[in-house]
């Protein structure tokens, strides 16, 4: 984010300010980080960030590893017939690149992205995901690492799980209303599959 701001002559935002916006679409992050700037300046920052991101992808210098235990969890969920979906603040192109890199593109029945729906915590992405797969709120769980994920789930009327190994800590996720806090993939698996959670 700092490089994108610098590329258009703006002072870089504080790291804690950037962290507080993670989970939101990029344009919304920039608007929150630079509220007094003209829309044209914010648009240039968004473009600079995306260019840098896709350059890092092209040259394979971005590191987005799966968290420990997540691949096995996805296998276990699929084996039980759980329908998987994604609702993310990323744009579709960025999400697909990430999923392709990990061989996960075909594992999700629905993929909702920030370039096709209102920003979290608006429930539109989650509502569209449920509609696409024929799910109901009572049979849906929103799992996320940001308070915006939890708030979106609450706004859609679904149960929510905060994973504490990502962007927000346990206290922040609990304050947002998470129904369960998972400290690791094993705890998440146990809660979802009913194997002791």
Give the role of each language-model region:
Residues 18, 42-46, 95:
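Short amphipathic alpha-helix in the helical subdomain of ABC transporter nucleotide-binding domains
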Residues 4-5, 25-40, 98, 129-130:
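Helix-loop "lid/cap" segments that line or gate small-molecule binding pockets
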Residues 180-184:
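Short acidic-hydrophobic, aromatic-tinged amphipathic segments that line or gate anion-handling sites
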Residues 1, 70-100:
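Substrate-recognition element of Asp-dependent hydrolases with the DxDx(T/V) motif
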Residues 1-20, 34:
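Active-site neighborhood of HAD-like aspartate-dependent phosphohydrolases
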Residues 63-65, 85, 91-143, 147-156, ...:
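Substrate-recognition "cap/lid" segment bordering the active-site pocket of phosphatases
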């Amino acid at each position: 984010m700092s490089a994108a701001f610098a590329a258009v002559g703006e002072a870089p935002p504080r790291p804690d300010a950037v962290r507080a916006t993670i989970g939101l679409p990029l344009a919304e992050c920039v608007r929150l980080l630079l509220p007094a700037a003209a829309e044209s300046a914010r648009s240039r920052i968004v473009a600079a960030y995306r260019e840098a991101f896709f350059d890092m992808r092209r040259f394979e210098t971005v590191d987005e590893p799966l968290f420990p235990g997540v691949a096995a969890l996805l296998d276990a969920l699929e084996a039980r017939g759980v329908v998987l979906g994604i609702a993310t603040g990323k744009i579709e192109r960025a999400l697909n690149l990430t999923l392709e890199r990990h061989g996960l593109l075909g594992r999700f029945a629905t993929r909702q992205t920030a370039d096709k729906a209102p920003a979290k915590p608006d429930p539109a992405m989650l509502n569209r995901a449920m509609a696409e797969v024929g799910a109901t709120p009572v049979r849906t769980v929103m799992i996320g690492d940001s308070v915006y994920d939890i708030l979106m789930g609450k706004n859609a009327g679904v149960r929510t799980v905060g994973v504490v190994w990502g962007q927000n800590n346990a206290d922040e996720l609990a304050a947002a209303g998470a129904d369960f806090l998972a400290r690791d993939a094993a705890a998440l698996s146990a809660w979802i599959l009913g194997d002791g959670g």
